[in-house]
Amino acid sequence: MDSLFVEEVAASLVREFLSRKGLKKTCVTMDQERPRSDLSINNRNDLRKVLHLEFLYKENKAKENPLKTSLELITRYFLDHFGNTANNFTQDTPIPALSVPKKNNKVPSRCSETTLVNIYDLSDEDAGWRTSLSETSKARHDNLDGDVLGNFVSSKRPPHKSKPMQTVPGETPVLTSAWEKIDKLHSEPSLDVKRMGENSRPKSGLIVRGMMSGPIASSPQDSFHRHYLRRSSPSSSSTQPQEESRKVPELFVCTQQDILASSNSSPSRTSLGQLSELTVERQKTTASSPPHLPSKRLPPWDRARPRDPSEDTPAVDGSTDTDRMPLKLYLPGGNSRMTQERLERAFKRQGSQPAPVRKNQLLPSDKVDGELGALRLEDVEDELIREEVILSPVPSVLKLQTASKPIDLSVAKEIKTLLFGSSFCCFNEEWKLQSFSFSNTASLKYGIVQNKGGPCGVLAAVQGCVLQKLLFEGDSKADCAQGLQPSDAHRTRCLVLALADIVWRAGGRERAVVALASRTQQFSPTGKYKADGVLETLTLHSLTCYEDLVTFLQQSIHQFEVGPYGCILLTLSAILSRSTELIRQDFDVPTSHLIGAHGYCTQELVNLLLTGKAVSNVFNDVVELDSGDGNITLLRGIAARSDIGFLSLFEHYNMCQVGCFLKTPRFPIWVVCSESHFSILFSLQPGLLRDWRTERLFDLYYYDGLANQQEQIRLTIDTTQTISEDTDNDLVPPLELCIRTKWKGASVNWNGSDPIL
């Protein structure tokens, strides 16, 4: 994650503060002097998620006088934890850093979790390319209870006051002397060196991992020791004089009892305990132990793992024998070789080369040990935390092949004419406020909520595609019923895949154009064009690879799911992916448009989202009409079997005929058009349309995002019992009439739900 995203998050924090405080003029001035971009966060919930402030937000709501802004929450957090320390942030007190996902920043982990070690290029920590383990990072970060801003200080303990470095009495002159001697070894000081008298801030990497809390023991020397070992080559290490080799161990003269006491006294193990234990191990693994630190030299495979201060003492953290295995690279996807191969394959698709997983430079004496000595404790990043993952966005690993450009006036005019029939028309408020947000009702978590009438056709089409992903693809195929109870992350992922399928299908499965709002005006409306505040702000992103499209939508899904223009953005993306020229060729009448009176969706728009072509009819193939004078009119219908089906009340009234390409789709999901409204009907049986025997008695589920539905509606369809068509239609729910256009004369049991009339 680059600095631009960090800057945008910070700007969003300021905008939220100004907005919540009612500083409207200041907000306007800020938007003028610093316009928003695609990376701007315009939703307060999204801002809390990015900064991981959910825990603080819940705590704040429970208070008698809750704060109103995220900036105040962060400020109060730091004041509560660090505002009362001695001298109020003196030179020895590190300044906390937010745990915001960014490059070269790691999420703190707990010792009880699975051991993970990330290896990457240590030659330049600020420019090193790091492997992204986004899903693992997210799962691990969600387990951080209480310390949401970086796990600095346990919420159940008062913060420690900053103390000077603890040393063994009488050893201070030796420490100072050793430090000065080692400082002379290099003419150019390393980036990690922080001299005892300097007033500089510690590195943010150390702060984020909680190393600034509690009594800090010999941290400057330890930092230099790590950097020193990193810069030392094998040849220089082997030929180093015995006198110089003793200078490094002299830095670690803090008492082990002090370190272990701070670890044992805490009820829960903190990162300080991990640091202390590993620091003790450093003392043991030193090539030559000083006289005042008696320890026997460990074999190479023992040096690759942390050990206890004594062989007979149990591990401080209660780790099992598994935890004492030789330290290797543990990644969710397998070992380092497998991970590197996957990265190489991914980068080969992108036409670039990945940064290799770093091979450790071993001392000559260690090379004979093979794999057991492949990773030494000194080779881990300078924070020495074993359980850590790198959280960074996908673009940092895979550079997407995306061509982006701002929309111009001519394109905006074409789109408006295609949508409304005139460039003077605009989207109404129902469209502007509609996005693809999911229901919070426990039994309807799969459902997309509709705020008002208007874009129901778009919502129903997207709902059908989301159900396709939830029920019949991926891991959900084994248990369709479980697919109706998705997690928030899973349903968002299915929404991403559904949107990707829609725009990719509209682009002929060769290209896709994704329209995103930038919050900045891209052109000045002139002439025969009426601005609506939406089209003028668009940035158009073209992609020619489906995998890149999914990744891009995953990064931008908040604009579609949270909004406010999610429904509009998808509609425009489908239009631009298909192109305005081809859509006009799809129409029976070239002057047709996609949005009708009162903002209702036309059949052409629904067909565009379901099949990728904006044809005007629902029958199969093409019908030729001969007027008798030699002129033949072509009426275009559905060209192939659709993934999602369609049923219409108009067919019951003999006003249209729905062909089998829509009546019998690949998946048992149907968009239902009834009374100028679109809703969804689906089955949990994937074989419903493949085996006629399953169509004797089966269940269908009905969902209407606009009906304020509070419970699941399950209909039982019985085709063995026929219902007379002469029944008074005024008393028959229109939904039953739509169902009988597919299953003639079938009886419909609402199973206790109130029939929708």
Swiss-Prot record:
The keyword Metal-binding does not apply. Residues 152-173, 190-334 are annotated as: Disordered. Its EC number is 3.4.19.12. Residues 232-242 have a biased composition (Low complexity). It comes from the Eukaryota. The active site is at C456 (nucleophile), H677 (proton acceptor). GO terms for molecular function: cysteine-type deubiquitinase activity; K48-linked deubiquitinase activity. It catalyses: Thiol-dependent hydrolysis of ester, thioester, amide, peptide and isopeptide bonds formed by the C-terminal Gly of ubiquitin (a 76-residue protein attached to proteins as an intracellular targeting signal). Residues 190-201, 299-310 have a biased composition (Basic and acidic residues). Residues 254-277 have a biased composition (Polar residues). Keywords: Hydrolase, Phosphoprotein, Protease, Thiol protease, Ubl conjugation pathway. InterPro entries: MINDY-3/4_CD, MINY3/4. Pfam families: MINDY-3_4_CD. The keyword Heme does not apply. The modification Phosphoserine is found at S219, S223, S289. GO terms for biological process: protein K48-linked deubiquitination; proteolysis. Probable hydrolase that can remove 'Lys-48'-linked conjugated ubiquitin from proteins. Belongs to the MINDY deubiquitinase family. FAM188 subfamily. This is Probable ubiquitin carboxyl-terminal hydrolase MINDY-4. It comes from Homo sapiens. The gene is MINDY4.
